[in-house]
């Protein structure tokens, strides 16, 4: 009897899977979108390249586009478009409603966070709570804090020169960005810049979990369990230590609010805790999730852009010398400082900053948008409402029709484009675009401008056991990753500029 029940269940399952497969291929709303039938039938096709191959699905996507064209249905429910000129239609601004894809793996891990908020109106409310803290005016008011940390960083470069120390630029610049971001959010200083080897448990945690990202993308909902495991049992145990720190800081702020001892200092966390919104938007869990996410986003991406930029200046001394000549117009002496506003006006420096961002790629994982009410039209194909649609930032950053010889670090391309009135910034999409673009863009740009200007004006550097090829993307681990190991950029300070 039991065997008959099992047999009947298996037959029923087989029939159900067959019916579902037929529906997805021949009757699904996306049936007219080009792509392999196996991808239309099952997510396992995508999961194989993500989880088994280790972050290689981005290259399979590229292959599918070469075969099927610029629009591809790459899993049963989602469409990918590889057309740089169409990017702004997917990641649009204005009042047009666009939701987050509820299937995005980070949604269950970071509930209550602005960037993972699914519904358009709810996202707009949460974004509005913190938006003013990321305005250019507000960031400019904190420029003295950024410059003081950059000066401390420069003193560490001088120390490295005197002792012949090899610098891991990602960790060096992450010390700067994590200290600044944590100060911005909590009003406290983790003081990574004072660590002898720029020790950063948070970044070490991100490096540890990196190889697991493709697997976690497949089993996204299991990520929630990681929060309840002892740090010693989790590959990124160091990451969870920051979780504990954020928990404590949020508790302190809420306690000070309750007993009236918060004081006049206004941090991002305090602004969130005192915002005129419903209490469910100010729970300890949501405040912790939101602030932790901001620190994560503000640490690695900006540090990576700085590491990429400084590496290329070290790799091609002619670029560094050209930049230094320009910097002398506003920074006549090595220890001179210039404002962010002054630095933004320097064309070659702007080109260096833009190339640093472009070739660091930002957050490259597909982050689909869903238009709940409106269809999108691409060429002669109608993408129905409710369809997750994405475009990887990597393909825009490396589009040879926009950026000729895209693998080259070429600041002059931006100088020439500005001279000719060609708006290349339209395709600098490392902060995304539209109503859900990264709020931290102004803070990140201020850090990058001030840090690159200071380092380039004061120091000569050479790469150390790092090649251009090692910076090229081979795997999609959320961030661009080399074939093996974490992203690493090392250099030595060889001289002090005059």
Curated annotation (Swiss-Prot):
Pathway assigned to this chain's UniProt record: Mycotoxin biosynthesis; aflatoxin biosynthesis
Gene this protein is translated from: aflU
Keyword field: Glycoprotein, Heme, Iron, Membrane, Metal-binding, Monooxygenase, Oxidoreductase, Transmembrane, Transmembrane helix
Primary subcellular site in the record, as a coarse category: membrane
Family label: Belongs to the cytochrome P450 family.
One Gene Ontology cellular component annotation held by this UniProt entry: membrane
Knockout or disruption consequences: Abolishes the ability to produce G aflatoxins but not B aflatoxins.
Record-given protein name: Cytochrome P450 monooxygenase aflU
